[in-house]
């Protein structure tokens, strides 16, 4: 449930029917929705234990708002559509806000956002600048400062009266007990209500739940619940022990201070010692708003806290005053809500999957549910310890998250809905595919593995599928089904047999044969693909070997340095470790891999079949980027990520995934992530794609001349 999920956009056609008299069905539905929504608000605001997702709550609330728009007689002051938050009895002392804490109306589509902006600009008399900021999914808080000293902290409550949580808020490191005048803003207001959001960092959420489970206590379903539950503790020491953070995003009552714009107020609040976000932007019109919304839709998980949308505000305070407010929300601000990425569903079972390196991973079998544009029936649980840390039982209602193309993940259980028959997951002791006893690869490993690496059908199928991928041999027709077909027909014993396949062997599998018994086009294409794959670059061969920890970057470093599989095989661990981009872990993994006899047999078979096992001898070309470290972020029109990395590395440069003071350049394409922002903060030179080409063609000095340094 979102704290500002109430003021929905109501279609004009429904407003036109404002005089309609409600029938019995409408009254009954309105009563049911009001009762259910009130219960959900109580569970959300007071118990910190909601039993439905934000998306489900928003959907019910929109239905109620539509009913009241069609039948105004049903709308009453105590309707969930008219309440800002939860006016419920709690154990905390009630305290009145000097100025009401209002909520926000929502926009769920570009059209609704555009309609809001059109009304704003019509009523304002022309275009206005907008301030865009992230909508933090946390707990709303009101901090009252008198003559610069914190005297009270209160939750939102019903907007007029909240709960006094001053003692707990004082324990949060981000909250200053006293404001400090600055040169730019030397006068601290006599009275200042600061509005903000207390959140639980995503990075600490799993550890908190693990600790609660170890203590035999119920875990939180998500970071927002963790923030609310941590703040509303009777013992402030518990609050102090948890890594709660604050971000401020506005003000209420004030005396002795009149900022001209919202953005000016943020600058003042920051200089006085209050933590404002560094991600807000002022844009001149709706196009800028749309760009900001799109950017964080793609990068919402680059942020340290959970977000569920973007808040858009008219920046000039004078225009805010002219636009005014409804009974519950300002007309000068709106929350654009992203499609939900978290939903509740039932955990039907927990099964395990065996990967290409033998790792046995538990996964959740779910009651199918629609989230983030697709239907999800499976979600990762990582390992047995993670299942225990999350505190999920088979039969639980669980919160799942799906973010874009990321594998769906189980966040935690809704303990309040746990059925009596719920049961714990027990990790199998034997491989479900080949029956081999499972064990950690070495003492202390979290993961358990099937040691039957050569013959386990699951591992072999995954390895064949992997080596056919775009990052390895790029064998187009050898997908998951094709890999399984080769194994099912016992055409190959291991991946070493792949490059000696012929038509007679493929004809043994129904997958590669037409109904009339002739060889299928996929078989012909596979043999053609295999011929082409034999000439792939050495680094792709190394990736295809499924050596643990050796991905494209490490494989390219090894290929560039040693130039043949034989040289890599003969190199010692210390020599391998010294290669830039390799290091001790990868070096040890390479040595372990080549120490296995059947691994070396795969290499021998591929070499005899004509697979390229060495780079062609070439004269050492110029290395203009020797010693230059480059970070690439976003999408480039002329280069894939791998191609950009290869272009840098072939000229002697180094590609890393994080920005630091040692970074020479950050290359920024479309939809860059937080790396671009970090580059600005560290004043690292930034290149667009045209500048990147200058770097490749003319070297670092020429690139510095066309780079921009922000911050």
UniProtKB/Swiss-Prot annotation:
Keywords: DNA damage, DNA repair, DNA replication, Ligase, Magnesium, Manganese, Metal-binding, NAD, Zinc. Coiled coil: none annotated. Residues 12-25 have a biased composition (Low complexity). InterPro entries: BRCT_dom, BRCT_dom_sf, DisA/LigA_HHH, DNA_ligase, DNA_ligase_AS, DNA_ligase_CS, DNAligase_adenylation, DNAligase_N. The keyword Transmembrane helix does not apply. The keyword Cell cycle does not apply. Residues 1-29 are annotated as: Disordered. Its cofactor is Mg(2+); Mn(2+). The active site is at 135 (n6-amp-lysine intermediate). GO terms for biological process: DNA repair; DNA replication. Its EC number is 6.5.1.2. SUPFAM superfamilies: BRCT domain (SSF52113), DNA ligase/mRNA capping enzyme, catalytic domain (SSF56091), Nucleic acid-binding proteins (SSF50249), RuvA domain 2-like (SSF47781). Pfam families: BRCT, DNA_ligase_aden, DNA_ligase_OB, DNA_ligase_ZBD, HHH_2, Nlig-Ia. NAD(+) binds at residues 54-58, 103-104, 133, 156, 197, 313, 337. One of its GO terms (cellular component) is cytosol. It catalyses: NAD(+) + (deoxyribonucleotide)n-3'-hydroxyl + 5'-phospho-(deoxyribonucleotide)m = (deoxyribonucleotide)n+m + AMP + beta-nicotinamide D-nucleotide. Zn(2+) binds at residues 431, 434, 450, 456. Residues 620-709 form the BRCT domain. GO terms for molecular function: DNA binding; DNA ligase (NAD+) activity; metal ion binding. It is an enzyme of class 6 (ligase). DNA ligase that catalyzes the formation of phosphodiester linkages between 5'-phosphoryl and 3'-hydroxyl groups in double-stranded DNA using NAD as a coenzyme and as the energy source for the reaction. It is essential for DNA replication and repair of damaged DNA. Belongs to the NAD-dependent DNA ligase family. LigA subfamily. This is DNA ligase. It comes from Salinispora tropica (strain ATCC BAA-916 / DSM 44818 / JCM 13857 / NBRC 105044 / CNB-440). The gene is ligA.
């Amino acid at each position: 449930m979102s704290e500002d999920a109430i003021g929905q956009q109501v279609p004009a056609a429904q407003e036109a029917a404002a005089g309609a008299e409600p029938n019995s069905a409408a009254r009954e539905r309105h009563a049911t929705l009001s009762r259910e929504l009130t219960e959900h608000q109580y569970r959300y605001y007071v118990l910190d234990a909601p039993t439905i997702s934000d998306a489900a709550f928003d959907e019910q609330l929109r239905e109620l708002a539509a009913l009241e728009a069609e039948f105004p007689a049903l709308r009453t002051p105590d309707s969930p559509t008219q309440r800002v938050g939860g006016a419920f009895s709690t154990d905390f002392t009630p305290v009145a806000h000097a100025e009401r804490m209002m909520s926000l109306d929502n926009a769920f589509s570009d059209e609704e956002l555009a309609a809001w902006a059109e009304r704003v600009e019509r009523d304002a008399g022309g275009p206005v600048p907008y301030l865009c900021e992230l909508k933090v999914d946390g707990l709303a808080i009101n901090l009252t400062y008198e003559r610069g000293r914190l005297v009270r902290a209160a939750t939102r409550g019903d907007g007029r009266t909240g709960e006094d949580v001053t003692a707990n808020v004082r324990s949060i490191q981000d909250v200053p007990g006293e404001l400090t005048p600055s040169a730019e803003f030397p006068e601290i207001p006599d009275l200042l209500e600061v509005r903000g959001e207390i959140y639980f960092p995503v990075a600490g959420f799993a550890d908190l739940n693990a600790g609660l489970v170890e203590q035999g206590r119920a875990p939180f379903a998500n970071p927002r619940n963790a923030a609310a539950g941590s703040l509303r503790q009777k013992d402030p020491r518990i609050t102090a022990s948890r890594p709660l953070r604050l971000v401020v995003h506005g003000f209420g009552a004030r005396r002795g201070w009149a900022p001209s714009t919202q953005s000016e107020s943020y600058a003042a609040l920051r200089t006085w010692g209050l933590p404002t976000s560094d991600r807000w932007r002022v844009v001149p019109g709706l196009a800028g708003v749309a760009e900001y919304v799109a950017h964080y839709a793609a990068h919402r998980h680059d942020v340290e806290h959970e977000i569920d949308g973007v808040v858009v505000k008219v920046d000039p305070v004078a225009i805010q005053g002219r636009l005014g407010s409804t009974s519950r929300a300002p007309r000068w601000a709106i929350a654009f809500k992203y499609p939900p990425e978290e939903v509740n569903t039932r955990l039907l079972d927990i099964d395990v999957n065996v990967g290409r390196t033998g790792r046995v991973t538990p996964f959740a079998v779910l009651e199918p549910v629609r989230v983030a544009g697709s239907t999800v029936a499976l979600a990762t649980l990582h390992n047995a310890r993670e299942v225990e840390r999350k505190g999920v039982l088979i039969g639980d209602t669980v919160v799942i998250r799906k973010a874009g193309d990321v594998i769906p993940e189980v966040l935690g259980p809704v303990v309040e809905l746990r059925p009596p028959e719920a049961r714990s997951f027990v990790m199998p002791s034997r491989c479900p595919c080949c029956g081999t006893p499972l064990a950690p690869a070495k003492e202390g490993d979290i993961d358990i593995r099937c040691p039957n690496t050569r013959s386990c059908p699951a591992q072999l199928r995954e390895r064949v599928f992997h080596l056919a991928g775009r990052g390895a041999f790029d064998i187009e027709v050898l997908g998951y089904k094709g890999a399984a077909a080769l194994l099912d027909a016992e055409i190959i014993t291991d991946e070493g047999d792949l490059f000696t396949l012929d038509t007679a062997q493929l004809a043994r599998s129904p997958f590669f044969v037409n109904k009339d018994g002739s060889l299928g086009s996929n078989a012909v294409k596979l043999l053609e693909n295999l011929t082409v794959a034999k000439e792939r670059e050495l680094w792709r061969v190394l990736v295809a070997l499924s050596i643990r920890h050796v991905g494209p970057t490490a494989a390219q470093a090894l290929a560039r340095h040693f130039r043949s599989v034989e040289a890599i095989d003969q190199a010692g661990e210390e020599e391998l470790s010294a290669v830039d981009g390799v290091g001790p872990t990868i070096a040890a993994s390479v040595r372990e891999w080549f120490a296995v006899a059947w691994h070396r047999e795969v290499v021998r078979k591929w070499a005899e079949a004509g697979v390229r096992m060495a780079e062609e001898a070439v004269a050492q070309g110029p290395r203009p980027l020797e010693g230059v470290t480059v970070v690439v972020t976003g999408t480039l029109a002329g280069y894939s990520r791998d191609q950009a990395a290869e272009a840098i590395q072939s000229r002697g440069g180094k590609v890393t995934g994080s920005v630091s003071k040692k970074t020479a350049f950050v290359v920024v394409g479309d939809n860059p992530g937080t790396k671009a922002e970090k580059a600005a903060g560290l004043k690292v030179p930034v290149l667009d794609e045209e500048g990147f080409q200058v770097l490749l063609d003319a070297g670092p000095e020429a690139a510095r001349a066309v780079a921009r340094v922000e911050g």
